[in-house]
Amino acid sequence: MAPVSGAVRVLDTAAGRFRVELAGGHVIVARRVLAATGLVDRLPDIEGLARHWGVDVIHCPFCHGFEVRDRRVVQIVTDPIGLHPALLFRQLTDRLTLVLDGVEPGHPELDVLRGAGVDVVEGPVRRIVSGEHGGVAAVDLEDGTSIAADAIVVTARFEVRAAPFASLGLVPTPLQSGLGDHVETDPSGAT
């Protein structure tokens, strides 16, 4: 069978089969459909942040830690779950600053981080400042404080793009971590 491509207009089930109607007029009938639409990263709403996402604005010490080792890293914590990677980033650089933007300063983890030499600053972030070569240069706070940075860490929320599959009952449910949504599956990956 030759490959067929096109945007899905209608997706329904009948007699144990899936019927997929494509925008170009093709109709495909199949026993299984692989729902692979990906996720959308929802970033904190901070001026200048999105333009650096995936380059100088990162989220994971395992994915990006090697590239930011020994650099000035500012971690913007907008939710308590964002405290989790801080100790891991601290192992990669002794120039880590945590900015608590909307997170209570009394978290027990903060004492551990301060004891490990992490600077902790409280206050809302105003914007991310770009340097002359286009990379991140600083994090500006609402109170006028400017913190020099070579890289910024944030916690992104995951949004499942499940709308095309809603007619089949595939709807996103919240992750237990609070980091976004997912489509529940059984241990074999079936929905």
Task: Kindly give the residue locations of the regions a language model identified.
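Short hydrophobic core segments
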Residues: V27-V40, A149-R157
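Glycine-centered tight beta-turn/hairpin loop motif at sheet-sheet or coil-to-beta transitions
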Residues: A23-G25, E142-G144
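General small-molecule cofactor/ligand-binding pocket signal
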Residues: A2-V4, I58, D119-V121
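FAD-site-proximal beta/loop scaffold in flavoenzymes
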Residues: R51-E67, F158-T191
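A conserved short coil-to-beta-strand element within the FAD-binding core of flavoproteins
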Residues: V4-R17, E122-G134
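Rossmann-like dinucleotide-binding cores of NAD(P)H-dependent redox enzymes
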Residues: I81-I128
